[in-house]
């Protein structure tokens, strides 16, 4: 598509088209004709004869154009020398290179000037792809940079150049860069173009346009094919690029220096430039070796296990790490631990008063000097290659936050089971609110991330999940399916084995979410946590009571519950208008009960508390406990439409339980929560509960 020149525009700069030529009688006339045929008329065409030795054939063709072109003849000095000669003699504000064997489409200059006219920065370099043709000008195929990189990346200075996507004749360059940066290096026979583009692109803005505007001829007479030292020159050029680039430039191009180097190595692996490939590969490996990881271990008693945990870090295949041990006011004799820490200079030991693991980890973060932070509880263990594999994974995928799968072991260190939590990855928010499978010793993140996101110290249980939720709300989560840590199960002292501690953690997480202005918008996802907490507290705390309840006749339980509900919520003076309506409502209730039980079966696989306990038992227990325990916190409840709705509109614990269970089921579906709320409102209105 041709972009028509805006006749009202005052942007109409002179463009100099420079054609360097050496023995170019075969193709030069076509090149000059394509330059003179440009629809943009404010141009000058400069032909520089670089000392051709073809009995004057090249010069004769050039002179035949008379004053239509500006013709110069000089001694042979190479392509770079001829281009420099043309630049020194050009009058235009923009430079456009045309090889003597290539061709411009008629709208090449006009199209690029129109693009510049729309850009605020008139010093931007415009470029695009090209069409490859054979010696007779017959079409071969298109070279499209946008098939290799996204448009955003094609506009990042240097990146398209370092992926071999820049064709010099597609460029439109402000002449100022030749005066302010450099000219072509005349000592380079075949890489003088990329050498100069590298220098200019480091300071200039570039803009990719997808329209094909040039034809590049592929034939056996091209100069670069005749230079025996071409590969050696290219190896040296690409190696120099790698050595000159700063870390900031690499990060700008690919997000991290490691990612840039690995992708550059991958690009170079398919070229003859194997020395440059080896350099890029070695530089990438060195990035990993140089990446320091700070491993933070909070300690409270259990010194023997703590020493085992530290040893699992000292045995890592990745050697650049520091171990930061935070003694959180242990009451046991810690002399052996202190003695052990002094044996290795990579271990730093700090003592503080007991304020909980969140406070201890935060102190560790403040004392860390690594690029990355990994957490390890004092009774857990790392696999020997944990840091190496997770670090490489994060660098390769440009993650700043990740976790892995893990194994559970008993107090003796014996294997119990594998937990495939690493499959939980990507954009996990907001579902992470209702299901957070991340184990502390599997986590690794950047120091910068944790400096900005500390653990909530006012929470003693569930503080880790609170932080993971907060971080995941703004960042992708990297997940590794391979098991790289061992989590020790310590009976009742382990959170998920202790109903009271587990429930308190869930309540803490819920409170944290509802008291955060942003997270509170996703309040329906806390329903799963609340119902699980109540179930744990009111059912798991008494195995005998549970067994007794399981043996009760379900229909009798429901009948008693209905009677209790009737006594509690219905006005004694109110009676139904007729028996038929009563039967209708009763049938509707039974139908809805069957529907809910059907929904319950569909989610049993994802909710272990449903598979373990009868549905009516959960309702009976929840109704007696929920409001008292879980709605005590009045802070910012106006941000939670769900809790406000319950407290204002409802008077019955039974109905609260019913809503909780329906919303728990609905929350497993992406669009189910609001629809269920509407359904419940209609149900209550029909039953005169407002």
UniProtKB/Swiss-Prot annotation:
Compositional bias annotation for Basic and acidic residues: 560-601
Keyword Glycosyltransferase among record annotations: yes
A molecular function GO annotation: hexosyltransferase activity
Biological-process GO terms, alphabetical: biosynthetic process
Enzyme class: transferase
Protein's UniProt keywords contain Ligase: no
Chain segments carrying region Disordered: 553-601
Family the UniProt entry places it in: Belongs to the glycosyltransferase 2 family.
Official protein name in the record: Uncharacterized glycosyltransferase RBE_0706
Species assigned in the record: Rickettsia bellii (strain RML369-C)
